[in-house]
């Protein structure tokens, strides 16, 4: 919103429309207009006026939120001499509006906290606030709100205050932490039975624990700690207060992760939590699930904090295994949501024990894990009145999947075979109800793959028992038994006499709608593992494939069946493969031809993606072993299918989703036959370029990268592939030149640089000598700022591989030429690239991208270290040394230290470490 400042009346109208306009488009227009206002420089003055006038809750909330947003994102717009008056104004507003609405108070508290963090001239802000407001009981709620959000905002991603300022703030808050604790004690004394005040106290205390600035020795003997456990032990504590106290204890436990340096507080928390067992049982008796969940969170956090002690000194001191008993008590609760809270701890315990690899230690924990697994098997039981198959996508279905993953990770402590046999014996010896049987089969399916299938009579017995289950058992039992059979495909492979009965059993399932998808998945597993044995059943698989749509399968299950069929097909004699592949593809090709011939009409789907996906999976997994000189058996089939794929692509050229599936299908066809697809190269490239000039589907760039990968080393294909690249670059560059082109088209960026990287890998000299290399590199430099994981990774990989070409494979005859060409490129754009990479790391990209950037810098350094040293020095000179408010972002020493660390690095990871530390100064 440039130009004149809007009137307050106009702003009020927009706010009213945002909240009260019955027309959604009116709300949308108001939202857009107010968003533009918030981004403008007028927002400061307007929000201040709205807060002064206090016309209604909505306008005050908008103004408070705007203030917070402006301070977070546009603080540089204000002159330094206005900061003090802004602070005073905000403090006046929060005092005047303290009774209007809690959400407004929170927004203003955040604004004040963010201001304090960015205003170095406001020294000792905690002391100032406490002195100003602590004696007025009516001001305590908003004072506590400010003191709660202040530590939370220190590490906020919205504020780029830099590591130097952050360190200064944390030291300042640590210095005044005792003042805050004293204030909280005073608030407790004044609160009496005021529950809201106690909740604010606990929230504030938790926030200071989370920042890690409270003195643990001081806190160990503090009355606030005793009060927390008192509140948690009392049966009459309300749910809200209980949750606030629980959160605070969890924060305290998290804060003492380094137990040795916080021993007195660790001991107090340890003893305090152990006293809560009785209160937990009381909450269970009262069926108060909220409190039960809170206790379980506390018990889990206790175990997480003392994990090292539990593993290293089990049963001694802080390694006391009563901690695990508490979690197992929670695992016994009938609601599965309770035990689920502790899953992360059990994962971590398993990980630690796996690394220690100590049989004696493992034996101590075995009984605990066995008890946990029994509890989990119980939790996995469906309701006795459940009808049909188990749901996999609802909350309970997802819980069962997490149980399955956890069991797989912990089974080594019990022993897969021992556990499998125990579970089976419960089915064999008793006559449990169906829901118990189903849950046991579910756990058995989770561990079946980790049981050694070699000469294992129990596994054989289980397999035999399952395939002879009567059809009268509950559908859910049949469903899970089918899943178990699929997981036991290794056993079938070792005992091929079972193949026929297993396939017979699975075919019955395939013919029943509720079981069809599970049966298809199991057949897919059997095909994957028993490829050689399944070759004799190929005709049966072909029959299934021909009548695929007569089974009630999910699209994924149908594709899985075809994948299994293709894997078996690849094991047939070469002379049979061509004919069988043609048979396998014929149904899908006929369907595509039918869609091409029919006129578009209402009610009839003309979507070819189902058939394209099926062809893609067939090509992807038909990978026979072909000797050099032999014609690929799939070549003829793919050449026959090409006209149908080409026509489908042409018909749906404007539809990105369908074109993407066409390209995917062609990609796997090309990969399937490799250089055997040479006859398709010319017509395919011509069609790609023609369609791409009209419709910029990025999947064409990806398909281009596949063609370069397959043919880039063929002398006769290089010029044609370069022509393709140059033709594709023209519309690509035009697309990216549009406003916000990079941000709006990350897939195009990703696929463009995949294509360019393939060229560098397969035919570097062809690209380096071309006209297009400099524009591509310029776009790569521009794209380094793009905060998109895949796109950025592709850009960095291109830059790394491009520069590496100048030093790689120095024994090859084209080395000197490559070295010279890279030298020319770098002399033209090297300084710009280094400056951009440094700027990008400091101001644009998240930390996870730094290893990729470090690799690019490392490669530049390998080409010419002295020149790189100069480029880096120039780049560092261009960085801002102070914030707009005068806080030091980076000192001269920090700049010279970073330069030295990078330029003297002997390994790439040293560059990465230096970058990590340096970029924190700007975050």
UniProtKB/Swiss-Prot annotation:
Pfam families the UniProt entry points to: TPR_TNPO3_IPO13_2nd, TPR_TNPO3_IPO13_3rd, TPR_TNPO3_IPO13_4th, Xpo1
Entry keywords, A to Z: Acetylation, Cytoplasm, Nucleus, Phosphoprotein, Protein transport, Transport
KW Oxidoreductase (keyword) present: no
Keyword Phosphoprotein among record annotations: yes
GO cellular component: annulate lamellae; cytosol; nuclear envelope; nucleoplasm
GO biological process, one term: protein import into nucleus
SUPFAM superfamilies, per database record: ARM repeat
GO molecular function: identical protein binding; small GTPase binding
Domain of life: Eukaryota
Modified residues annotated as Phosphoserine in this record: 74
Broad class of the protein's primary localization: nucleus
Quaternary organization: Interacts with (GTP-bound) Ran. Interacts with (phosphorylated) SFRS1 and SFRS2; leading to their nuclear import. Interacts with NUP62. Interacts with RBM4. Interacts with CPSF6, promoting its nuclear import.
Role noted for this protein: Importin, which transports target proteins into the nucleus. Specifically mediates the nuclear import of splicing factor serine/arginine (SR) proteins, such as RBM4, SFRS1 and SFRS2, by recognizing phosphorylated SR domains. Also mediates the nuclear import of serine/arginine (SR) protein CPSF6, independently of CPSF6 phosphorylation. The nuclear import process is regulated by the small GTPase Ran that partitions between cytoplasm and nucleus in the predominantly GDP- and GTP-bound form, respectively.
Protein name, as recorded: Transportin-3
Gene: Tnpo3
């Amino acid at each position: 919103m440039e130009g004149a400042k809007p009137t307050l009346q106009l702003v009020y109208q927009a706010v009213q429309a945002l909240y009260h306009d019955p027309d959604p488009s009116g709300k949308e227009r108001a939202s857009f207009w107010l968003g533009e206002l918030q981004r403008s420089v007028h927002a400061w003055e307007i929000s201040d006026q709205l807060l002064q006038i206090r016309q209604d809750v909505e306008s005050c909330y908008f103004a408070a939120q705007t203030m917070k947003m402006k301070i977070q994102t546009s603080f540089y717009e204000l002159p330094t001499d206005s900061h003090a008056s802004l602070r005073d104004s905000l403090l006046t507003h929060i005092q005047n509006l303290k009774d209007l609405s809690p959400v407004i108070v929170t927004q203003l508290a955040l604004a004040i906290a963010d201001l304090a963090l960015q205003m170095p001239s406001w020294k000792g802000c905690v002391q100032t606030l406490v002195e100003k407001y602590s004696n007025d009981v009516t001001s305590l709620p908003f004072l506590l709100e400010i003191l709660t959000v202040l530590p939370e905002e220190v590490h906020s991603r919205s504020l780029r205050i830099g590591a130097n300022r952050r360190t200064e703030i944390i030291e300042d808050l640590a210095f005044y932490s005792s003042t805050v604790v004293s204030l909280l004690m005073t608030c407790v004394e004044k609160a009496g039975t005021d529950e809201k005040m106690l909740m604010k106290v606990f929230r504030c205390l938790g926030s200071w624990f989370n920042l890690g600035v409270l003195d643990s020795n001081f806190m160990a003997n503090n009355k606030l700690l005793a009060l927390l456990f008192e509140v948690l032990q009392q049966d009459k504590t309300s749910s809200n207060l209980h949750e606030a106290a629980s959160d605070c204890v969890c924060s305290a436990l998290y804060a003492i992760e380094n137990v040795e340096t916080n021993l007195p507080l660790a001991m107090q928390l340890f003893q305090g939590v152990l006293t809560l067992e009785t209160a937990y049982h009381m909450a269970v008796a009262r069926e108060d699930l909220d409190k039960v969940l809170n206790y379980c969170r506390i018990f889990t956090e206790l175990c997480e904090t003392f994990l090292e002690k539990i593993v290293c000194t089990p049963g001694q001191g802080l390694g006391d295994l009563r901690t695990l008993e508490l979690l197992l008590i929670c695992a016994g609760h009938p609601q599965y949501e309770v035990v689920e809270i502790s899953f992360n701890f059990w994962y971590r315990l398993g990980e630690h024990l796996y690394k220690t690899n100590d049989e004696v230690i493992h034996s101590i924990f075995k009984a605990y894990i066995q008890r946990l697994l029994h509890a989990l098997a119980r939790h996995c039981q469906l309701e006795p009145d459940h009808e049909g198959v188990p749901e996999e996508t609802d909350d309970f279905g997802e819980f069962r999947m997490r149980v399955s993953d956890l069991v797989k990770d912990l089974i080594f402590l019990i022993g897969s075979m021992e556990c499998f046999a125990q579970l089976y014996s419960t089915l064999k010896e008793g006559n449990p109800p169906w829901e118990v049987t189903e849950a046991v089969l579910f756990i058995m399916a989770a561990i079946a793959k980790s049981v050694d299938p070699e000469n294992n009579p129990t596994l054989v017995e289980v397999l035999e028992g399952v395939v002879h289950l009567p059809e009268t058992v509950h559908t859910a039992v049949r469903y899970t038994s089918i899943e178990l059979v699929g997981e036991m495909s290794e056993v079938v492979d070792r005992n091929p006499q079972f193949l026929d009965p297993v396939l017979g059993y699975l075919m019955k399932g395939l013919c029943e709608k509720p079981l069809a998808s599970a049966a298809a998945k199991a057949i897919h597993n059997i095909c994957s593992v028993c490829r050689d044995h399944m070759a004799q059943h190929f005709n049966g698989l072909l029959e299934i494939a021909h009548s695929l749509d007569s089974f009630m399968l999910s699209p994924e299950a149908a594709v899985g069946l075809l994948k299994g069929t293709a894997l078996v097909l690849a094991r047939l004699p070469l002379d049979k493969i061509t004919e069988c592949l043609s048979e396998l593809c014929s149904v899908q090709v006929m369907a595509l031809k039918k869609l091409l011939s029919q006129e578009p009409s209402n009610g009839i789907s003309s979507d070819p993606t189902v058939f394209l996906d099926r062809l893609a999976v067939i090509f992807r997994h038909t990978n026979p072993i072909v000797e050099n000189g032999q014609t690929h058996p799939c070549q003829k089939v793919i050449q026959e299918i090409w006209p149908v794929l080409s026509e489908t692509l042409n018909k749906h050229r404007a539809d990105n989703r369908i074109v993407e599936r066409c390209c995917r299908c062609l990609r796997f066809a090309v990969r399937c036959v490799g250089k055997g697809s040479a006859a398709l190269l010319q017509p395919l490239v011509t069609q790609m370029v023609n369609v791409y000039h009209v419709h910029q589907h990025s999947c064409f760039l990806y398909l281009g990268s596949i063609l370069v990968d397959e043919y880039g080393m063929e002398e006769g294909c290089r010029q044609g592939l370069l022509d393709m690249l140059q033709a594709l670059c023209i519309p690509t560059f035009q697309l990216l030149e549009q406003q916000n082109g990079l941000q709006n088209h990350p897939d195009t960026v990703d696929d463009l640089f995949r294509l360019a990287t393939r060229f560098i890998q397969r035919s570097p000299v062809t690209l380096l000598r071309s006209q297009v290399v400099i524009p591509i590199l310029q776009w790569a430099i521009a794209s380094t700022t793009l905060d998109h994981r895949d796109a950025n990774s592709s850009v960095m990989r291109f830059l790394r591989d491009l520069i590496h070409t100048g030093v790689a494979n120095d024994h090859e005859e084209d080395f000197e030429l490559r070295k010279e060409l890279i030298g020319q490129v770098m002399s033209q754009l090297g300084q710009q690239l280094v400056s951009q990479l440094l700027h990008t790391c400091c101001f644009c990209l998240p930390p996870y991208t730094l290893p990729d950037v470090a690799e690019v810098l490392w490669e530049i350094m390998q080409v010419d270290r002295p020149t790189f040293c100069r480029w880096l020095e120039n780049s560092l000179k261009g960085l801002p040394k102070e914030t707009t408010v005068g806080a030091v972002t980076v000192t001269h020493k920090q700049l010279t230290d970073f330069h030295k660390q990078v330029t003297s690095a002997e390994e790439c990871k040293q560059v990465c470490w230096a970058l990590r530390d340096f970029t924190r100064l700007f975050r």
